[in-house]
């Protein structure tokens, strides 16, 4: 059934929809299945994503039609369509009237993913009216809170050198805590790897007290504040809160230095919201494990990594992993820096829409996946700043001297870039950074050809 007469209006102007502040606008790449027209399928998507179905129903009235999602723009040559969703379509909390992210996802990227007349459909951007942003939680704390604890400048506190405890699984409590202590002697921030929690060989109630003690000892030895991101991911919110409460109680006076890591993609929006609303004083660390199933550049359905990051800011994530922008081991390229810009700035141009955040706190880009001291200068140069959290597991524990030396090499890498120094010349006066060349020779050969001769290192 062709529903374009009701669910499409190509005379609508985007600037008018934006000025009206009454719609969420969504941009998709779309390819119809063979034998179907582009506008026909686009209208069917809008219908299925709002008030329609595959037949006319007798219960539809004029009010219902007033909240139809409408296709307002198509670019068939480039396979792009845009839909305006009336804001009133989205479910609201009974408790506080906030708009539910799950409702947005259910409509904008729900049943339309399985329609028979659609070959491919992927959301690549969306726009939220500035006047409606207060209906989303947004972050409660951000990187400025961490900078304050670290004694940094409150507006431009710079790079936070972090790691992931490696190996990701298999360490018992004592070796785990020792690995944390060794890194903290040179670095700032440690996160649980996303599967770490309460395994039988490393029970939470044994390892967390040891990690809290390791933090205290490292702080005493270095005179620096240390940060820990503890995984509270679980199948239900009672278990999440049980873990969170135990962790905060165990860290005691150092509890403000604890972030909560949540596997937000596999766990879903409700898990992020549980952490955000129950623990607004803690840094909310959104890990996106599993997202590549739909956000991979090879995927043609679902939504992009850009969309996931933008959603995370609305949900209230203090920070989210954004890949490595082509400088690490994860999928992505240099243009992914726009993901970071969208979540850290108060306004930014996305692939389709210019989003103003109206003062909503920023979400910090968290960089991880194959990064080390040699790869970071190029990364910083591409991004244009170093106000990120970087968690380098192999880049720390793979350093030829020690995890502390690996952590120090990360810090030195940032200082090298910030000062505008040539990395090889900088290495001559910075031992830990220099030893990173020997620690990661394959990277050194690729990024800094001739480094052996220049640094006097021989095979």
Curated annotation (Swiss-Prot):
This enzyme catalyses: 2 (2R)-3-phosphoglycerate + 2 H(+) = D-ribulose 1,5-bisphosphate + CO2 + H2O; D-ribulose 1,5-bisphosphate + O2 = 2-phosphoglycolate + (2R)-3-phosphoglycerate + 2 H(+)
InterPro entries recorded: RuBisCO, RuBisCo_large_chain_AS, RuBisCO_lsu_C, RuBisCO_lsu_C_sf, RuBisCO_lsu_fd_N, RuBisCO_lsu_N_sf, RuBisCO_lsuII
Domain of life per record? Bacteria
Q: How many and how are cofactors bound here?
A: Binds 1 Mg(2+) ion per subunit.
Q: Which residues bind Mg(2+)?
A: 191, 193-194
Site for Transition state stabilizer, residues? 329
Cofactor section: Mg(2+)
Gene Ontology BP term (one):
reductive pentose-phosphate cycle
Induction (record text) = Induced by growth in high levels of dissolved inorganic carbon and low NH(3) levels (at protein level).
Q: Does the keyword Ligase apply?
A: no
Q: Which residues form the active site?
A: 166, 287
State if Metal-binding is listed as a keyword: yes
Q: Which GO terms describe its molecular function?
A: magnesium ion binding; monooxygenase activity; ribulose-bisphosphate carboxylase activity
E.C. no: 4.1.1.39
Q: Which sites bind substrate? A: 111, 168, 288, 321, 368
Described function: RuBisCO catalyzes two reactions: the carboxylation of D-ribulose 1,5-bisphosphate, the primary event in carbon dioxide fixation, as well as the oxidative fragmentation of the pentose substrate. Both reactions occur simultaneously and in competition at the same active site.
Tell me its family.
Belongs to the RuBisCO large chain family. Type II subfamily.
Q: How does it assemble?
A: Homodimer.
Leftover remarks: The basic functional RuBisCO is composed of a large chain homodimer in a 'head-to-tail' conformation. In contrast to form I RuBisCO, the form II RuBisCO are composed solely of large subunits.
Query: What is the designated name of this protein?
Result: Ribulose bisphosphate carboxylase
